[in-house]
Amino acid sequence: MPAQTDLASSSGIVLFIRYAFMPNHLGYCGGNENELLLERAATGQADPRLTPLLTQFTGATPYLRSIAAANGVRDPFDRRVVEAYWLGNELLARVEARDLYQMLEERFGAHLPPKLREQVLRKPPEGAKPFHLFHVVDVYRHLERETVGMAAMESCRISWGQVRAVDGASVTVDRQPLVLREGKFALGEAQPERVLRSFDGLGFAEDVSVGDWVSVHWGWACEVLDDRKLANLRRWTAHHLTIANRTI
């Protein structure tokens, strides 16, 4: 029987791939093994031997390591750590501002002009945590050479939608889009949107039903959300939009 740490690592690897697959498939992050990662994760064959492939996601890995270190977790791909990064959970609260500040300065500081560098580095003392949305709205949009528009940030953030129809490889969800309201980030009125739930017959939302809530990343249904995960995602999303709006 695998050790408990191996089980936590394996489930964390699956969870990471659920969210990382589609941007990896689209060529935005990670290496070139997206089909292998999807197959292994969707068929329950993910194990710690896949970790070297996951470390190629160089945007996410520093945040995972920060969360793990702050919580005394050896493996940055532990399920609890991965969940904290993508969806938010209690592990985020234990990350000290000074530690996130140091990580951001070391990893991204040299890639930002002085004014933007100062703007990003002021966010940890204001309450920012190593949460995916923080990277999207307060780091990623400043790192790209070309302007990152609302459409890219909207696709890149982890959102949630309630399933209204299931149709083969796709589901239709009611989902709130990211919008600008009086020059500030906000969530708009829910709108129907069709998202993929499987690719070449493989996916992570096979048992979804009308009325379920799913997380969405780059038009991909990552998983069915229980009440706890949905509440955490909503909470940490609102928190980081508030922080982003201070300097938008």
Where on the chain are the PLM-derived regions?
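N-terminal intrinsically disordered, low-complexity, charge/repeat-rich segments that act as generic
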Residues: 1-148
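Structural detector for short beta-strands of small beta-barrel domains
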Residues: 151-174
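Beta-strand/loop nucleic-acid-binding surfaces
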Residues: 182-205
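Short, Lys/Arg- and Gly-enriched loop/turn segments at beta-strand edges
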Residues: 219-232
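Short peripheral tails and domain-boundary helices/loops at the edges of structured domains
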Residues: 229-248
